[in-house]
Regions:
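Non-catalytic architectural context of zinc metalloproteases
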Residues: 1-130, 134-141, 154, 171
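Solvent-exposed, acidic/flexible segments
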Residues: 28, 114, 118-125, 183-191, ...
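Juxtacatalytic substrate-recognition/specificity segment
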Residues: 96-225, 235
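C-terminal recognition in membrane/secretory proteostasis and scaffolding
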Residues: 236, 246-500
Length: 500
């Protein structure tokens, strides 16, 4: 499993999460643990390169009988399973972050083939990390490790107590020709680093109460993932501009991508963001071609709920960053530096920051309900203009051209294609008697706006031929997704919003 969730071994790399490698001994989960990684000398001699160990655990190494043995120690089973390791050829750099009178060491290691400008990455990443510590006051860790694997196209990250494990397309890493303003692909990697780094405070330290002593034998459910992943998905890109690594203009482009994704998800009218949080195990991580029609992502909508909540708080002299800081301070007051959030104590904090009726109305409409988020109204109040650019999603379906015709990938709920009975994985071979092609599809759809006649499609579903009629567009069909672009019209208001 090459992902950040499991374990992986080949002749160049040993990687593992102890959740995949070490069973808990019932009743002894809180005892100190020693784990040994025994590597045969052959592993080091395959490519004749120097390899290193990366892990947030305390470690020692010694040689014995043609073997290299790494001894890792953890205070308990939780720390062991929350500290992945990698042994591989690695490039690395270190940087320090100031935390009051203290200096917090940060290590970044990267494996896999890459040709990236690590000096540029060090400069940018150190600014981002420093911005978090300046805001939150200190760190919940003594030192921190970024562990990254570069591949051709894989993407993901997983937060841990004092580290994060990342996998990224090598094209997302900074080049030696990177402009002062990071490229969109490099911004994506910085956003990933920012997201997982913030989780050290906002998931590992402050977390849903049901996660404090989670049972590893089963899934643990909560309706609060919109708070933890949603707030993080708002804060991660926000901190890129707050740190000065990207411009306000670039940040608005990233925010527009979130907004576009939200409006292209028709399931937002059917599922609340709280329900989406609860369904993470059974729906979000088992998505299919109908997911966008049936539900909403607590990452995506959660980020935009956080944006709207931040604007509501601004109107009452507070920020969402104040709310997060209140919970982090509660965690620091605990002996184990952990705090469990519940719906009740979230209400308590929000009622201190907002009038009670404002919070109750917001919660009922946008968190527990499916009322459309007032994004454009609120952005306009903060000095941001919104321009609309129509997307030509013909008949309300995503498709790809193949030699046999047009293969349908996804059908939008209540669209013309849905009304005709077209489904994902259908192959449209002919439209109105002519071979189906993207050009002919668009021409037919354009003609329908004038003639208002149905289009006759010959469609293969598996090996069965169907004849389906696609009606002309009408008010009964859902308005197709659109692209929104944001720009600054009032710099003074925007500057107030984009500071903490």
């Amino acid at each position: 499993d090459l992902s950040v969730r499991g374990a992986y071994v080949d002749e160049t790399r040993l990687y593992g999460n102890f959740t995949s490698l070490a069973l808990a001994v019932q009743g002894q989960e809180n005892q100190a643990i020693k784990a040994e990684l025994i590597c045969p000398q052959d592993f080091y001699e395959v490519n004749g390169v120097e390899v290193s160990l990366a892990t947030a655990l305390a470690e020692k190494m010694h040689q014995q009988a043609e073997q290299t043995i790494y001894q890792l120690t953890a205070d308990n089973y939780e720390q062991l399973t929350d500290s992945p390791f990698e042994i591989a050829e690695q490039d690395e750099f270190w940087f320090d972050v100031k935390s009051g009178e203290n200096t917090i060491a940060h290590r970044f290691v990267i494996s896999g083939v890459h040709h990236s400008d690590l000096e540029r990455l060090e400069t940018d990443l150190s600014k981002i990390c420093q911005s978090y510590v300046d805001w939150l006051g200190d760190t919940p860790f003594d030192d921190y490790l970024f562990m990254t694997m570069a591949t051709s196209s894989d993407y993901g990250g997983l937060e841990h107590l004092a580290s994060t494990s990342l996998i990224t397309p090598r094209d997302d890493l900074p080049t030696f020709f990177e402009q002062a303003e990071p490229s969109e692909s490099y911004q994506r990697f910085l956003g990933l680093c920012s997201h997982e780094y913030f989780h050290a405070w906002w998931v590992k330290t402050v977390r849903p109460e049901v996660f404090l002593n989670a049972n590893f034998n089963q899934e643990t459910y909560t309706t609060l993932l919109w708070v933890f992943e949603g707030f993080t998905s708002y804060v991660d890109d926000f901190m890129l501009q707050k740190s000065g690594v990207i411009s306000q203009h670039s940040y608005l482009k990233l925010l527009a991508e979130q907004i576009n994704r939200y409006y292209q998800t028709h399931g937002r009218a059917l599922q609340s963001v709280a329900e989406s949080s609860f369904d993470a195990w059974i729906k979000l991580y088992r998505s299919d071609e109908n997911t966008a029609n049936a539900g909403i992502s607590y990452y995506n909508k959660g980020a935009l709920v956080a944006l709207c909540l931040d604007f509501a708080l601004i109107n009452h002299g507070k920020r969402i960053f104040d709310v997060i800081k209140v919970f982090y301070d509660k965690a620091k007051a605990q002996d184990n530096r952990r705090f469990g959030m519940t719906d009740a104590n979230l209400d308590d904090v929000m009622n201190e920051c907002l009038p009670k009726d404002v919070w109750q109305d917001f919660n009922a409409k946008y968190i527990d309900g499916t009322t459309e988020l007032p994004l454009f109204e609120l952005l306009s109040e903060q000095g941001v203009s919104i321009e609309q650019k129509d997307d030509d999603i013909t008949w309300g379906m995503k498709y790809m051209s193949e030699p046999t015709g047009l293969k349908v990938q996804r059908v939008v709920r209540n669209s013309q294609a849905a009304a005709a009975g077209i489904s994902a994985n259908d192959v449209i071979v002919a439209i109105d008697g002519l071979k189906a092609s993207e050009k002919w599809l668009k021409s037919t759809a354009k003609t329908q706006t004038i003639s208002e006649d149905p289009a006759v499609c010959h469609v293969f579903r598996r090996d069965e031929l169907l004849v389906l009629e696609v009606p002309p567009v009408s008010d009964a069909h859902v308005k197709q997704p659109q692209t929104w672009m944001l720009s600054i019209v009032n710099e003074k208001k925007v500057n107030v919003w984009m500071q903490i």
